[in-house]
Amino acid sequence: MPWSETPAELARARAERPFVVAAPSGRLFAVLTPAAPEAPPADLCVVTLTRPRSHRNRMWVEGARRLAAQGFSTIRFDYHGCGDSSGDSAPLDPNRPYRDDVVAVIRHARQQFGVQRFVLAGSCFDARTALSAFAGEGASIAGLVFLAAPVMELDTVVQVHADTKDWAHLWRALFKPDNWRALAQPKRWKYMATVVDRVSRQSGNAGDLPLSRGFIEDFRALVRSRARALFLYGLEDAEYASFRVAERTVFAELPAEVRARFEIEVWPGTVHGFLEMTRQRETFARALGWIEALHPNARAARSADRTGLPAAS
């Protein structure tokens, strides 16, 4: 693992306990990392979503113990059909999120551990699943970390990403051997056909492509809640091309007081996939830092900085 645990984090590791959640599609295996009793309580439970529950290089394990040492409780779990959970597995589609799984975990934590307020974090499919929880649990969710997720149907994402290409891009692509090898895959042929079609028609306008109905419904539930949210993308992410349509439409229509709850960050390069170690660590650090700022002590310190008064102890 790419980190060394502090004594406080090791204590949180030893305090972890597994539990099982009954969900409609299977019994979900989960791990609770309880907040350090000596830390100022955040009164928030952070639920991290991915497959498997540890994420790449066990970064959600690292995050769970670091946050718990600061007074957050945390939960990581396996979706149905994944890892140690029961149920049937299937190809994942961000527009068909596993809402029942995450809602079951939230309600189990409330009933069994007395947790009342939650923060959800995930990337791509997991971000869309986290967002979907607002439809049934918006009143109990205080924060959302939404990393590099598509907000259109997957076939539409391909089209909107194709609209960022031109003939010069296609010409350069012809001279890359990896592109020719990739054409052995049927899905790559379909993608290339879409790119050529969109470029040849010179549509160049993603505005003619719709956002996913599921995203719009879940986004409206987020708006109705009082939660804060961080939306983070890479400029070169295919998913960002679809999110730009959301920026121009559903985000632009928000009242100022609602829009102020949502932060949008677009970084150079890519964020999606966590495939490159340096960017993975940068994204992880940003997500944890954003969550840490939700701690009441952090908010009190920021308020004191603005007023010039000492923060309450």
Name each region found by the language model:
Residues P91-Q112:
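Alpha/beta-hydrolase active-site loop
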Residues S25, A35-D78:
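Short, surface-exposed "cap/lid" segments of acyl-processing enzymes
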Residues F77-D93:
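Glycine-rich "HGGG/HGxG" loop immediately N-terminal to the catalytic nucleophile
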Residues P7, A11-A13, A22, V61-G63, ...:
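Serine-hydrolase catalytic core
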Residues Q112-C124:
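Alpha/beta-hydrolase fold nucleophile elbow
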Residues M1-P41, E276:
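N-terminal cap/lid segment of alpha/beta-hydrolase-fold proteins
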Residues A127-G138, L144:
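Short glycine-enriched nucleophile-adjacent loop
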